[in-house]
């Protein structure tokens, strides 16, 4: 019985390898999404410029910060770090929070622009976070579950409108992402 128990313990631990849910690294500059996205209601796209057009949402450059902070709160210690990086023409070395394995492919534009998925679906209550942390587990099972439960968003997409209408003729259930190939291995794995 102890051998079986040991095997189960090892197997259960393997399922958690690489899961970084709640990971909250210390950043080189204390940045509050609660202030920027919450209090000041700055849209995610303003700083994360690639979210609608790219695989990556992009981590903001010093220049993005300087659009506001060349004049706003320039006397604060954390803002001075931004000013120094700008003056020395050096990037801010942000620590990546949301990591997927190299064997996984994830495209922000496909999910946000085409799929209509809100940032909070994966990133959680970002507008309430003083310090960003990985809200979701971002495991394969977590992604697959989302693809099984999420209805295809056809808003503004004539092709998907036709798919939804055709699906409706043959099924009483709504068209889900899994129904249009959302569970095919090659969609997310190279």
For each of these PLM feature ranges, what is it?
Residues 2, 21-23, 36, 86, ...:
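A generic structural signal for short, solvent-exposed coil/turn residues
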Residues 62-102:
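Structured, soluble extracytoplasmic/luminal domains of envelope-associated proteins
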Residues 1-5, 9-10:
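Single conserved hydrophobic/aromatic residue that forms the stacking wall/gate
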Residues 11-25:
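Aromatic-capped interface at the extracytoplasmic side
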Residues 26-75, 109-190:
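Sequence context surrounding c-type heme c attachment/ligation sites in exported
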Residues 1, 21-25, 75-79:
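Short, mixed-charge, low-aromatic patches
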């Amino acid at each position: 019985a102890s051998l079986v128990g040991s095997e189960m313990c090892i197997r259960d631990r393997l399922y958690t390898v690489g899961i970084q849910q709640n990971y909250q690294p210390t950043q080189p500059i204390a940045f509050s999404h609660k202030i920027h996205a919450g209090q000041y209601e700055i849209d995610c796209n303003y700083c994360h410029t690639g979210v609608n057009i790219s695989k990556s949402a992009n981590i903001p450059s010093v220049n993005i910060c300087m659009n506001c902070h060349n004049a706003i709160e320039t006397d604060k210690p954390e803002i001075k770090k931004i000013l120094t990086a700008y003056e020395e023409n050096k990037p801010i070395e942000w620590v990546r929070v949301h990591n997927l394995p190299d064997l996984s492919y994830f495209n922000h534009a496909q999910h946000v622009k085409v799929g209509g998925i809100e940032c909070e679906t994966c990133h959680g209550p970002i507008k309430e976070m003083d310090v960003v942390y990985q809200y979701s587990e971002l495991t394969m099972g977590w992604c697959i579950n989302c693809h099984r439960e999420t209805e295809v968003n056809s808003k503004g997409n004539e092709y998907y409108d036709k798919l939804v209408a055709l699906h409706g003729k043959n099924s009483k259930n709504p068209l889900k992402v899994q129904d249009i190939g959302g569970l095919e291995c090659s969609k997310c794995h190279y």
